[in-house]
Amino acid sequence: MEIFVKRLKELRKDKKLTQMQLSKATGLTASAISAWENNARVPSAIAIITLAKFFEVTADYLLGLSDI
């Protein structure tokens, strides 16, 4: 999950969003986003899809299965 953690942080920071702002924009909890970014929890499939749609990337990209 380290690739997911890295890519989530990069995508969020590229959009200049705080964890709270990302939470409000996606409907995901700020505590969950924090836990994912600290590699303390594994996101659900629904959360991964939600993040992928928000950032306009594929779930495969978020998970490190593709570089596009």
Task: Annotate each PLM feature.
Residues 16-35:
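Short alpha-helical DNA-recognition segment
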Residues 32, 42, 61:
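Residues in the helix-turn-helix
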Residues 13, 27, 38-40, 67:
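Residue-level detection of the helix-turn-helix DNA-binding "recognition helix"
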Residues 1-14:
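A short, Lys/Arg-rich alpha-helix, primarily the initiator
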Residues 37, 47, 63-66:
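DNA major-groove recognition helix of helix-turn-helix
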Residues 12, 23, 52:
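The alpha-helix within a helix-turn-helix
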Residues 46-61:
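DNA major-groove recognition helix of helix-turn-helix/homeodomain DNA-binding modules
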